[in-house]
């Protein structure tokens, strides 16, 4: 039996540190791949056979925000259904494709629609796109979502910079560890990178776009939360609630991606108002917020790209 920190165990088992394995070019591993990485490698090979593009920033678009990708300088697009073994979104407002192109001079890959745990996928499937974008070459992951406002000071249409998170869904790291991506027990103390948050915060200030900042909590869905559940998550310290994002941030952090995230407060959570919640309301609010969202994301991505070495 091997004892010691996970990184030392990995070094003794394989002759490679987790960082060496993680930073190695796709397809260069000579020892046995984990099943997770083997599947990921097949998706990557399918991508490379169709698309010749290496992004610097990966962007995930949430409910009602997907049209942002149509406004960038597009070089190529790839439907999820064209990638063998890749999960496909079934939710309205999620187109289900990768868009490759430029935001300013920054090379980006955009997920125009994500998959969710509540759709019946395994958590490994839910975070597969995040891991694939890491293999594509992305160094930064910019997560967006439509979320319910838990903080009484928030209003529908606000933007919230995610400072931290609470994940009430199963961890995407449960089960076999993909040593090729990261260590068994990754640190999460800076899961939303402080330096990247500073960039987005300063960008919003210069653009005169109001920006809240708070804690995001992921529940499983697909049902909206009960008033009692909202009281619970507020007690836990959450400012906004949704059904995605936190698991993606965990997988990204594990794989060595720097993460930043913004929630569009699409509605006030159950119990704050007497109005019933609907998915149509989420999309309607996101549509109204879209112009400012596009402005903030565009300028933030440009500055994030420039900040990379």
Regions found by a protein language model. Give the residues of each.
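Short, low-complexity intrinsically disordered segments enriched in A/P/G/S/L with frequent Arg
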Residues: 9, 18-29
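Metabolite-binding pocket within alpha/beta catalytic cores that recognizes anionic/polar moieties
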Residues: 30-188
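Generic non-transmembrane alpha-helical segments
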Residues: 46, 50, 195, 199-210, ...
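Non-catalytic positions within long, well-ordered alpha-helices that form the structural scaffold/packing
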Residues: 134-135, 234, 253
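Metal-dependent peptidase/peptidase-like ectodomains
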Residues: 178-219
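Active-site/ligand-binding-proximal alpha/beta "capping" segment
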Residues: 206-239
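Zn-dependent metallopeptidase/amidohydrolase metal-coordination segment
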Residues: 243-281
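His/Asp/Glu-rich mid-to-C-terminal helical/loop segments that flank catalytic regions of hydrolases
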Residues: 270-309
